[in-house]
Every structure is written in C-alpha cells, then in structure tokens.
C-alpha cells in the first residue's frame, strides 16, 4: 500500500488557487516566477537571560512548543559593558521553520493566535523590508494555544519574520493577503 503524504491546508490552497491568481495578477511567464513562502524565522530576545541562564532555557522550551521543532539558544558575540553583557552569554533563542511545519505555523498564527491578541486592529502593511520579506512583533508569547497560561511564569515578546521568494513588496503583500494575513486598511 502506498501511503499518501500529508499536505498542509495552506499548501494545498496555494497550489490550487493562490498560484494561479498571482500569475493572472502579475502576468508571470514562468510558473517558477510566482512568489512562494520560503521560511518563517521565530526569534525571542531574552534580556534577563544575562543574569539567569534558566530563563533562556525556559524561553527555548516555550518556543519549541510553539514551533513544533527544537529552538536554539543564541549567544552574544561581543561584550557590551553598558548592558553588562560578556561574550558567549545566552541572550535569546530562535527557530527556523520550512515546508510543512512553516505552513502549519502560519495557519495557527492567522486563525488562532492573532485573534487572541488584545486590541488587535490588524497587521501593519508597511513592515516589509523592500525585498519581499515581512516582519511582525508579538508582545506576549502566551497568545499561542500551546503555551499554558497558568504554567507560564513570564511572558516574553517575539519576532516573526516571513521570508518569501517575491522580488518586490507588492508581490509579497499580494501573496500574504491571499494567505489571509489580516493587514490594516
């Protein structure tokens, strides 16, 4: 028996609808020119980890729960006296998602996590970097359903960067709008 491979809902939607809609809108000659999602990078900067190494490990464990993949603790590269920071001290954690896990995370972000943000009015449509990548910041990581609100000792902010193969911001904005990213009007 041949097993059918699991395909995330957003990937199927991209293959069936979004790809053809973007080709029609921008007039691509080749199917490989159509922008697609490349990766999603989640980053937590933990300033308190300088004094307490356990906080970096706790944040990495929470980020691993959110992402569904092991997070890596990041260390400082240079010493900065004003921040009382020495070289090779833990200062945060990060994880890079690709393929199926990326599509699953984006699905959870759009449909579950962002609606749980207090006073959410939409994402800033100007947060593109000029090369087709979108970045957003979240003030509390406890908006994700994987994090138990009662067991979470602290709530940390996090950065989410969605990297696409789009050449311009307009193409990337059209791609993310097709994925139902709730941009502000």
Swiss-Prot record:
UniProt protein name: Large ribosomal subunit protein uL5
Keyword Cytoplasm carried by entry: no
Lineage, uppermost ranks: Bacteria, Pseudomonadati, Pseudomonadota, Alphaproteobacteria, Hyphomicrobiales
InterPro entries the UniProt entry points to: Ribosomal_uL5, Ribosomal_uL5_bac-type, Ribosomal_uL5_C, Ribosomal_uL5_CS, Ribosomal_uL5_dom_sf, Ribosomal_uL5_N
Keyword Coiled coil belongs to the record: no
Signal sequence range: none
Gene Ontology cellular component terms for the protein in this record: ribonucleoprotein complex; ribosome
Assembly behavior: Part of the 50S ribosomal subunit; part of the 5S rRNA/L5/L18/L25 subcomplex. Contacts the 5S rRNA and the P site tRNA. Forms a bridge to the 30S subunit in the 70S ribosome.
GO biological process: translation
């Amino acid at each position: 028996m041949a097993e059918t491979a699991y395909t995330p809902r957003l990937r199927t939607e991209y293959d069936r609808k979004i790809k053809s809609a973007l080709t029609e809108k921008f007039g691509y000659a080749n199917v490989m020119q159509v922008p697609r999602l490349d990766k999603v990078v989640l980053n937590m900067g933990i300033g308190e980890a300088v004094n307490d190494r356990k906080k970096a490990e706790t944040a990495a464990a929470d980020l691993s729960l959110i992402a569904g993949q092991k997070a890596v603790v990041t260390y400082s590269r240079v010493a900065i006296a004003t921040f009382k920071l020495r070289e090779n001290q833990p200062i945060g954690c990060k994880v890079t998602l690709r393929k199926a896990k990326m599509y699953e995370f984006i699905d959870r972000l759009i449909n579950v996590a962002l609606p749980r943000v207090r006073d959410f009015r939409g994402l800033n449509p100007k947060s593109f970097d000029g090369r087709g990548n979108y970045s957003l910041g979240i003030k509390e990581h406890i908006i994700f359903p994987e994090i138990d609100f009662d067991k979470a000792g602290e709530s940390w902010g996090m950065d989410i960067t969605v990297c696409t193969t789009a050449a311009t911001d307009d193409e990337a904005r059209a791609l993310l709008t097709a994925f139902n990213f709730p941009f502000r009007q």
